[in-house]
Amino acid sequence: MQNKLGTVRAISGDDPALREGAIGLVRPDERAEAHVLFRALWVVTSALLLLAITAATCSVAWEYSTRRYVKGFSDAIVPSSSAPEEKVDAILHWMSNGPARLDHGPDGSIRDPTETLNYASLLKVCGTATNAFVNLADSAGLSSRRLLLLDSNRRTMHVVAEVLVDGRWIVVDPVFRTVLRDSAGRTVTRKDLTNRSVFLAATSGIPGYDPAYTYDRTEHVRMARLGGIGSFLRVAFGRLAPGWEDSVTASLVLERESLATMMGAVLLMMALVLLRIFLRWYGVRRLGVYPPEMGARLLRAWSAYFDSGAGV
């Protein structure tokens, strides 16, 4: 670089002016690249949000339809003015002596009450029989949840239900169509059934009951099949909502596919809305970019469509 005398002055690599100029030369390309990446991410997020809104709308309609369907069943089976124990007996009586149903249904892992209520084969499997019972009990105004009986390896060997009656979670076995009772005829809880004598008195009179189905190891929510992710989710949910495993809502979500789908779609939609809010803040504050609003784009597309139609 020449000074006023025409001599050449060497510029050090650490010269602040040189460093400033170099940054100024690179910054436009980096900013342009960041703008392109930001706009692409914005478009993808907006598209996913539209899909999530559509999924949430469809799942809400599905859950509403399922709820109406199960409510119709419970209204026809359970007298609304009955006591809680009478409602339980009415549901079990219907499961045993209800109208003829189709013999062969889907596999036993299904969790859709519109299916489990209509196939005799599904009402003979502990998982789907409990699914039908829990959904009918919920529609009849009872607080009910499923209970998993585990073996020594923590694997599920049987599924029953618990119903809140007079402040106690009494045990009901839907597949055997019975309310478990002790030798005096009193209803029993899960804790009561850990007593060997009470367990034998409650189950010895049930035809075909496997004595291995004990209540020594039980869970309401089984997440071990998810491996490490299941353990992480259990800990995370436990910190966010202590006692969530014992809640009626958690059990109902697991026993009704439409409700689980609806909650998943709504949570995804909320997460994408929050992501768009963050992206908009980042674009405006950090990049100086104002992303176009989805509503404004749709309005322009709508107007252009009608303008082209009017021109024709």
What are these regions (language model features)?
Residues Q2-L25:
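N-terminal intrinsically disordered, acidic low-complexity segments at the extreme N-terminus
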Residues A34-W42, S247-M269:
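Juxtamembrane/start-of-transmembrane alpha-helix segments at the extracytoplasmic/lumenal side
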Residues T54-K124:
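Secondary-structure boundary elements
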Residues S46-A52, R256-Y282:
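Selective detector of the "anchor" transmembrane alpha-helix that sits immediately C-terminal
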Residues N131-A201:
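Hydrophobic/aromatic-rich core segments of domains that either
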Residues F176-S247:
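Extracytoplasmic/lumenal ectodomains and periplasmic regions of secretory and membrane proteins
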Residues M270-A301:
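Juxtamembrane interface at the cytosolic side of transmembrane helices
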Residues D29-W62:
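Hydrophobic secretory-pathway targeting helix
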